[in-house]
Amino acid sequence: MKYVSLDSDEKILSFISSLNQSSPIAVDLEGEFNLHIYGEHLCLIQIFDGKDFYIIDPRSKAVSEKAVVAFFTSDIQKVWFDVQSDNSLIFKVYGITINNVFDVRALAKALGFMGNLISLEEEFLKLNKDSVDKKKLQQTNWLKRPLTDEQIEYALSDVEYLLELK
């Protein structure tokens, strides 16, 4: 998948200001949760605006905490699947909560659907994804750079259909 790397504060802030406040974006995170190193760390932010994919690497020296916080606290609606653990990570790392979130998982649960994102996409969008590969990549080392093409494909696939599920 092609994507735009928002690899500087200037690009992140420009991206935020370019978004239409009435159009939601799909967002997800990859983090490290005591699997490869002690502690919890934000490793990647992936975004889909319905047309293009974007990646923010918060581990990059060119990306400041201020720019990442500006993204999460912006008024743009962020469509997520199961934001609870990601919001907890953001609070632990930055001391903030994510603003203006629509949680697809909360909606699915309210409608009686208890499955994960893959099963939700299969059920409602008739997609067929290989959950074995997804499971393997969930536990990859997201702190290690450079990220592989496989890791990036995995990360972007988590936001690809969220806007449709909303």
Segments (PLM) and residue ranges:
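Short amphipathic alpha-helical segments and helix-helix/interface helices
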Residues: 13-16, 44, 64-69
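An N-terminal domain-cap segment
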Residues: 21-22, 26-27, 32-40, 56, ...
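Flexible, charged surface loops at secondary-structure boundaries
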Residues: 17-21, 48, 70-75
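Active-site-proximal helix-loop-helix substrate-binding element of RNase H-like nuclease domains
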Residues: 3-5, 46, 53-66, 73-163
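N-terminal accessory regions of nucleic-acid-interacting proteins
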Residues: 1-25, 29
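A short alpha/beta connector and helix-capping loop motif
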Residues: 35-51
